[in-house]
Amino acid sequence: MRTHDDTWDIRTSVGATAVMVAAARAVETSKPEPLIRDPYARMLVTNANAGVIWEAMLDQEMVAKVEAIDAETAATVEHMRSYQAVRTNFFDTYFADAVAAGIRQVVILASGLDSRAYRLDWPAGTTVYEIDQPQVLAYKSATLAENGVTPAAERREVAIDLRQDWPSALRAAGFDPSARTAWLAEGLLMYLPAEAQDRLFTQIGELSCAGSRIAAETAGNHADERREQMRERFRKVAQTLGLEQTIDVHELIYHDPDRALLGQWLNEHGWRANAQNACDEMHRVGRWVEGVPMADDKQAYSEFVTAERL
């Protein structure tokens, strides 16, 4: 259960979800024709010791094992992996376009195990700020350093909870509000209540000069009944395979009916926004997975929103 002042490291609560996402990137990277390449994802998963269930996701045969128990759940697992690859690719492209337009200041909110500061081709003079819980940032930087991995841009950690005064901490780390910025909120908004989401984007707007850009993944809107059905099916599959569920992701997410539509909100607050439904993006890049239970419900899918400050 979430509280207003809860905290975590890489093995617990919201922190452990970053391991799940990195596992999906590692699986995608190992494919013959990967949509994205993250050579550091696997080491970030295996060194986290966040639980057997996350490391099991690295197993290429996992979907086959799940399929023998529950075909729809297997399709959902494969869908989740594909979704993470599509999402990563979309935001990688966003950053490539931003730096091509001359932006040299990047802020990744709730960066988790995001390795873009290390794996993307950043132009000289680019500074990447990563904001997250202190223990999460410490784990990532230490693990990569111990394995001889160095950033491809100037990387600055801002170790603070986004519910605290992160704008002041960001400025103290050297952030320049007068310089155009490329912001990213990926895998974040579903862990915020509606009012916190509005406050976050208000703060971003206050720190963004004209020409700045933002990209964000919105929270999907699964029907309560369907969400509970899938939750129970995942639990049974994990139990059958002998995988201990160290966290329940559903308990970490805020299912808030009053949440603003992000694209619309940004258009009303000094940005020019566009939104791409994740379902459509998966079809566009050829990564749609057939047989998922929510295939007929576009509202169940997140949107990838991009916007430019006017």
Curated annotation (Swiss-Prot):
Keyword list, A-Z: Methyltransferase, S-adenosyl-L-methionine, Transferase
Binding residue positions for S-adenosyl-L-methionine: D132, D161, L162
Entry EC no(s): 2.1.1.-
Domain of life of the organism encoding this protein: Bacteria
Classification via Pfam families: LCM
GO biological process: methylation
GO MF, one annotated term: methyltransferase activity
Role played: Exhibits S-adenosyl-L-methionine-dependent methyltransferase activity.
The family this protein is said to belong to: Belongs to the UPF0677 family.
Record-given protein name: Putative S-adenosyl-L-methionine-dependent methyltransferase MMAR_0357
